[in-house]
Amino acid sequence: MQSTLSQSPGSRFSQYMALTKPRVTQLAVFCAVIGMFLATPGMVPWHVLIGGTVGIWLLAGAAFAINCLVEQKIDAMMRRTAWRPSARGEITTPQILIFSAVLGSVGAWTLYTFTNPLTMWLTIATFVGYAVIYTLLLKPMTPQNIVIGGASGAMPPALGWAAVTGAVPGDAWILVLIIFVWTPPHFWVLALYRRKDYENAGLPMLPVTHGEKFTRLHILLYTVILFAVTLMPFISGMSGAVYLTSAVLLGAVFLAYAWKIHRDYSDELARKAFRYSIVYLSLLFAALLVDHYARPLLGV
């Protein structure tokens, strides 16, 4: 193990950045930013856009750092996560706690200063939901950890909407519901091809507790529900034909993956489905944004 003194500043920075799970944070912040733009017919005020993005990013990073701290022993037993600096003992517990506290404090101040108190408190509640309720309580105790804990991970669009309007109306909750229903099939395909990792770590993920066949069926069922839920922005009048077409096409591909996994499973297929699920959510929310600004131009 390298000592702190022997590490370059760049290496140290990379280690701290790894604690924030940058790729996961990017997707969460992206969905929050989409929520900001959908909340207004025009341009999001710059101070809200920048302040909201930075504040949500910092608090999300703080939550992920706590997750890495709590799960460092578990991460060390799993091939997918053994590389993390927390799992390798390259960053100490006090250092992670201080890092998370700084990120969280600066993030909360940024949201309070540049957006509004509601956004700050909702983001703090999301932090608690992920770092405490999901990480400490749900994940090690129940195979429904992803289903219940998915509520905190689904909040970014509502946070973005609140940052602009100071409220969270029904349309924002539709976006939250989409991510909430997307979360189980997204994580269960990962848990399928990483089942041995979770089994060795003693985590009660669905494939470990209920078996592969049961999990494959539930991936299909949740993907069908997701397909239906993604039609709600069009049904409610929030979005138009551009979004509807995108949602149907993207959802059809996701359904095809879920059906193949249910009928003829392979680890390689599950890997492809997992990667696609990330692309799916990104493109779905991008379609919401394009539709939002295209509708006035198209007169629909």
From Swiss-Prot:
Question: What are the recorded GO MF terms, alphabetically?
Answer: protoheme IX farnesyltransferase activity
InterPro entries for the chain: Protohaem_IX_farnesylTrfase (IPR006369), UbiA_prenyltransferase (IPR000537), UbiA_prenylTrfase_CS (IPR030470), UbiA_sf (IPR044878)
Q: Where does this one sit in the cell?
A: Cell inner membrane
Which reactions fall under this protein's catalytic activity? heme b + (2E,6E)-farnesyl diphosphate + H2O = Fe(II)-heme o + diphosphate
Q: Which UniProt keywords apply?
A: Cell inner membrane, Cell membrane, Heme biosynthesis, Membrane, Transferase, Transmembrane, Transmembrane helix
The top EC class is: transferase
**GO CC terms:** plasma membrane
Q: Describe the family membership recorded for this protein in Swiss-Prot or TrEMBL.
A: Belongs to the UbiA prenyltransferase family. Protoheme IX farnesyltransferase subfamily.
Q: State the name under which the record lists this protein.
A: Protoheme IX farnesyltransferase
- In its UniProt entry, the species of origin is given as Burkholderia lata (strain ATCC 17760 / DSM 23089 / LMG 22485 / NCIMB 9086 / R18194 / 383)
Encoding gene per record: ctaB
